[in-house]
From Swiss-Prot:
PANTHER family: UDP-3-O-ACYLGLUCOSAMINE N-ACYLTRANSFERASE (PTHR43378), UDP-3-O-ACYLGLUCOSAMINE N-ACYLTRANSFERASE 1, MITOCHONDRIAL-RELATED (PTHR43378:SF2). Belongs to the transferase hexapeptide repeat family. LpxD subfamily. It comes from the Bacteria. One of its GO terms (cellular component) is membrane. The gene is lpxD. The active site is at H257. GO terms for biological process: lipid A biosynthetic process. GO terms for molecular function: N-acyltransferase activity. Pathway: Bacterial outer membrane biogenesis; LPS lipid A biosynthesis. This is UDP-3-O-acylglucosamine N-acyltransferase. Keywords: Acyltransferase, Lipid A biosynthesis, Lipid biosynthesis, Lipid metabolism, Repeat, Transferase. It catalyses: a UDP-3-O-[(3R)-3-hydroxyacyl]-alpha-D-glucosamine + a (3R)-hydroxyacyl-[ACP] = a UDP-2-N,3-O-bis[(3R)-3-hydroxyacyl]-alpha-D-glucosamine + holo-[ACP] + H(+).
């Protein structure tokens, strides 16, 4: 359940008819279309004026016991809704719920000013040569360097540092304590607190002494990208590091110099991508995946969590393991090893007898 201290509900909430229309569902016979809902909550904590959702058999008991006024459910669970809960049947309840949450709690979609600031707050430092469109918000302690450009509707959080010449598009959110240098950001980009974009890539000419290789590329972040807290994106060495449109990156991810990430990729926390690797569109990397440098992971491929990728991955593949391989081969190896270990244990027990 949302805490009103942190999340402001839409002023009038939504009627059941509005919820059904937004979710693309019909209303069951006898349901009151004018019934009003003030917010959304989990099955366990929802009350009569809350919307919930359910699409996992593990929560069947919670659905049967919920007090939610309405619940978005897939067809197979609709009959399990209790009498006091309106079942809104959807083929994708979670996606419908996400869209409705954005309407019930619009301020949760994108971070806003932490100080209810409009314009540039006292205590922020904006260089005279920086260019800010009307409607930019800058929280206390933020620093914006010479030649930086920031588009209308963007919020720069407290103690963020926007380096010289950095360009940020419109309706972006730059979190507290972030640093951006040598970077160009598109529109509607969200950068969460503590992220670092545009610092030196890790490049050295190795020898008796290690000679630093100047990193003279940039970071390019296209529209609708989200970058998690404490993620680091190094600028390119001699070409740009690129993050494609619509890609979502979790917390604590390391993206090295010259990496090119396609459109609508998903990268889960703990991932490390070494230099000059390319991810084509719609690639998914599970948590703690490691990818060595100078590889290509094909469009639509999925890599299981904690895997290590050390060779190119064809488009549309599902790989896992260390080193990563097609999941069928990986599972076959795991099963074979388990059987061998079991057999060895039995043989050892027989010898001991």
């Amino acid at each position: 359940m949302s805490d009103p201290v942190f999340f402001t509900a839409a002023a009038t909430g939504l009627t059941l008819a509005e919820i059904a229309a937004a979710a693309g569902t019909g209303l069951p016979e006898g349901a009151d279309p004018d019934r009003r809902f003030s917010g959304a909550a989990s099955l366990e904590s929802a009350g009569p004026d809350h919307l919930a959702y359910m699409d996992n058999a593990r929560y069947g008991d919670a659905l049967a016991a919920t007090r939610a006024g309405a619940c978005l459910v897939s067809p197979r669970f609709a009959a399990r809704c209790p009498a006091g809960t309106v079942a809104l049947v959807s083929r994708d309840p979670y996606r419908a719920y996400a869209a409705l949450l954005g309407r019930l709690h619009p301020d949760a979609l994108r971070p806003g000013s932490q100080f209810a600031v409009r314009g540039v707050a006292p205590g922020a430092h904006v260089h005279p040569e920086a260019r800010l469109e009307d409607g930019v918000t800058v929280d206390p302690g933020a620093v914006i360097g010479p030649g930086a450009e920031i588009g209308a509707g963007t919020v720069v959080g407290p103690n963020a540092v926007i380096g010289p010449g950095v360009r940020i598009g419109r309706d972006c959110a730059i979190g507290a304590g972030t640093t951006l240098s040598h970077a160009l950001l598109g529109n509607r980009v969200i950068v969460h607190p503590g992220a670092r974009l545009g610092q030196d890539g890790f490049g050295f000419a190795m020898g008796a002494t290690h000679l630093k290789v100047p990193q003279v590329g940039r970071v390019i972040v296209q529209d609708d990208v989200e970058i998690g807290a404490n993620t680091t994106v190094d600028r390119g060495a001699s070409r740009d590091t690129v993050i494609g449109e619509g890609t979502k990156i979790d917390n604590l991810v390391q993206i090295a110099h010259n990496v090119v990430i396609g459109r609508h990729c998903v990268i889960v926390s703990g991932v490390g991508i070494s230099g000059s690797t390319t991810l084509e569109d719609y690639v998914v990397l599970g948590g703690q995946v490691g990818v060595v440098g100078h590889l290509r992971i094909g469009r639509g491929s999925q890599i299981a969590g904690s895997s290590n990728v050390n060779r190119d991955v064809p488009p549309g593949s599902r790989w896992g393991g260390t080193p990563a391989k097609p999941v069928r081969a990986w599972f076959r190896e795991l099963t074979t090893l388990a059987r061998l270990a079991e057999r060895s244990g039995k043989d050892q027990a027989g010898d001991d007898a």
